[in-house]
Curated annotation (Swiss-Prot):
It comes from Shewanella sp. (strain W3-18-1). InterPro entries: Syd, Syd_sf. The lineage of its organism: Bacteria, Pseudomonadati, Pseudomonadota, Gammaproteobacteria, Alteromonadales. The gene is syd. The keyword Chloroplast does not apply. This is Protein Syd. It is found in: Cell inner membrane. GO terms for cellular component: cytoplasmic side of plasma membrane. Belongs to the Syd family.
């Protein structure tokens, strides 16, 4: 089953929750990065958060190049989860704790995502572990949320280790179990490592990539 209907509904509920509770759109620190998601004026040198809303992409993003580069078919949800929208990360509450779903802010962010998916999968191969790909973070970034590439199930994964706890049999069921979390925007630190120099999606997975790329 495609995860897109569940993602569509969560995005709708997410923005409605902010409008109902705060009377405004959610806010995000773009850190100088433009995006069609931005509502209102945008100044690249501003350090203030902006209002945003998700925008469906004119051309759906694809990970076919990643599949070809690694000679590895990816579970189809990856194209739908990351390729349909431009969006800021989505905060959530759940029975497993609080966390966020990663999304793509602009085209450059998507290219960085592809590169880092390759890096993650190469690390899994180096560690002789089954392939996975990440969708978000749990418990303030201490745990990764990853997809088992063989069956599409959702798991908790500690960087450098194998998946440890299954949360859901599918990405659809996982997203359907989440509730939007209303919270003020958080300004993420820029990372010094070359693989992490993009201030969009990867500033949100600092702990993960410090662990993975620090192994060399």
């Amino acid at each position: 089953m495609s995860c897109l209907p569940a993602l569509d509904k969560f995005l709708q509920n997410y923005h409605q929750a902010y409008l109902t509770t705060l009377g405004e759109l959610p806010r995000y620190y773009p850190q100088g990065e433009p995006s069609v998601c931005i509502q209102g004026e945008f100044f690249a040198d501003s350090d203030k958060p902006i209002a945003w809303q998700p925008v469906k992409r004119d051309e759906v993003g694809s990970f076919t190049n990643v599949e070809h580069a690694l000679d590895l078919p990816l579970w189809p949800d990856i194209h739908l989860f990351y390729g349909q929208y431009f969006s800021a990360p989505l905060l959530f509450d759940s029975k497993w704790g609080t966390g966020e779903l990663l999304q793509v802010w602009n085209d450059d962010d998507f290219k960085c995502l592809q590169q880092n998916v390759i890096g993650h999968l190469m690390m899994k191969k180096k560690l002789k572990q089954p392939p996975t790909w990440f969708i978000g973070l749990l418990d303030e970034g201490d745990k990764m949320l990853t997809i088992n590439n063989s069956d599409g199930s959702v798991w908790i994964e500690i960087p450098g280790e194998e998946q440890s706890e299954q949360l859901s049999t599918s990405l659809t069921a996982f997203i359907e179990a989440l509730s939007p979390r209303i919270a003020p925007p958080v300004k993420h630190e820029e990372l010094p490592m070359p693989a992490l120099d993009h201030p969009g999606i990867f500033a949100n997975i600092k702990r993960m990539w410090q662990n993975l790329f620090g192994k060399g």
